[in-house]
Amino acid sequence: MIRILTDSASDILPAEASQLGVDVIPLNVTLEDGTVIRDGVDLTPSEYYEHMAGCKKLPTTSQPSPELFEKFYAEAAAAGDEVVGIFLSHELSGTYQCAKLAADLANVDNVLFVDSTNVCLGEGLLVRLAAHLRDEGKSAVQIAATLEHAKEHLHLVAAIDDLKYLRKGGRLPAAVAVAGGMLGIKPLITIKEGKVAMAGKARGLPGAYVALFKKIEELGGVNPRFPSLAGYTISTREVNPIQTYLVDNLGLSEPLVRQIGCVIGTHAGPGAFGLAFFDNGLVID
């Protein structure tokens, strides 16, 4: 059997993980009072954002312990199963390296690793693709190879209400954050070579949607042969214009809609929304 493993930065919550047949190792979030919660397990995203709104100090995030990975690998090996692990970009977290180190510590060779070079919605799309390929009967080697190909055509574009969260979390240079936050500008970000990068700026919320749609087209458009994934932090209303754009303007299927989880929400901040998609250049045999 092939087991699909990911981390909670993919924002696949337990109920959906069970439905997809994938396993999720949670990252950790340390709250202002020192309480450590497991991402996607101990608090719902909505509960977390409510707590975050009252924080004077930004919560911190940390990778899982190697022991969690070791235990999973050992159980899979004992059952004779192979593992395909898909993790958030190594440029943004030590989780990928931690997952690989754990395989060495567990002395197993049944794990194939995929650095998504993405995060959140983008990482989640790769995990869903992996589950689909497994259900089609592909081998672990075939799944990993297809994901390596697919991630070259994977994009995440998001509008951020305030870049201060990314700056405080160390995911964006201070000078870029200041420039993006000037004069009521709504900055757009993307993931480029595994890192957070500025993708544009717009004035006000309507302008942010227009800029986001323009960037999507610049990146190759939304491939109708694969699902897309829209994400929000506070309210589903944040993604309504994205749904309208895809369905009414482009004639595409509605995107999947998911709430952005605690780890990524810590850095993106309240009011963030975006879309992950595969571009029209992706072809999978």
Model-predicted segments: where are they?
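Mixed-charge interfacial surface used for oligomerization/domain docking
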Residues: 3, 9-23, 28-30, 34-35, ...
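Class I S-adenosyl-L-methionine
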Residues: 35-85, 89-108
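Local beta-strand N-terminus motif with an aromatic residue
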Residues: 1-2, 80
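Short, contiguous strand/loop micro-motifs
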Residues: 1, 59-60, 86, 117, ...
